[in-house]
Amino acid sequence: PINWIDTSDMDFKEEFIGETFGRINKAEADLLLQELKAYIDRIGGKRVLEERIDFGIISPYKAQVQYLRNKIKASGSLKPYRSLLTVNTVDGFQGQERDVIFISLVRANEDGQIGFLNDLRRMNVAITRARMKLVILGEAETMKRHKFYKELIDTSIPSHRLAERKTHRLILKYLFPS
C-alpha cells in the first residue's frame, strides 16, 4: 500500500543550503521521523527487531539525506532500530529494496517547481523500493501541478482520509495557535 502524507496545510517550505544549491525541508524531515517512529510503535518495536523489518528513507536531495541521518543519530527513540534504517538519495538506493520505504520529496513552493523530481525514471526507482509499504511525504499543492504526481496523490489519499487529516490539522491549529 501507498500512503501520501500531505504537508500542504503545514506551512513547510524548502530552503536552499550550501554552495551546491542543495535543498532541504527540515520540518518535512522531522515529520517523517515522527511518522517512522509511530509506524514502528504500531507494528511493535519488539516485532520489528525480532523479524528484522527494515526501513529505507529516500530523498532526492543530499542535504535532506544528511539532515535525516544526523537526526536519526541524535534520536534516542530510534537508536534500537538504527541497524534496520538506511537513509540515502534516490540514486544511492538504486538496486536495493527494504520492507518499508519513506520518501521525503522536499519540494514545497508557490511556483510548483519540482526540479529533478520531473525525472520520472528516478521517481520510479524511489517508489519501487518497498516490499511491503510505501509512505511519501510531500506538499500536494506543489506536486499536483504535475500530471504524474497528481495521479499518484489521487490514488494514495482516499478522500475520507484527506478530510480526516485536514480535520486533525484544524484541531491542532485551534489547540496550539502560533
Positions of predicted regions on the chain:
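Conserved nucleotide-binding/hydrolysis micro-motifs of P-loop NTPases
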Residues: 10, 62-65, 92-94, 107-110, ...
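Helicase C-terminal subdomain and adjacent C-terminal extension
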Residues: 112-178
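Amphipathic alpha-helical transducer elements in NTP-driven molecular machines
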Residues: 29-33, 65, 87, 100, ...
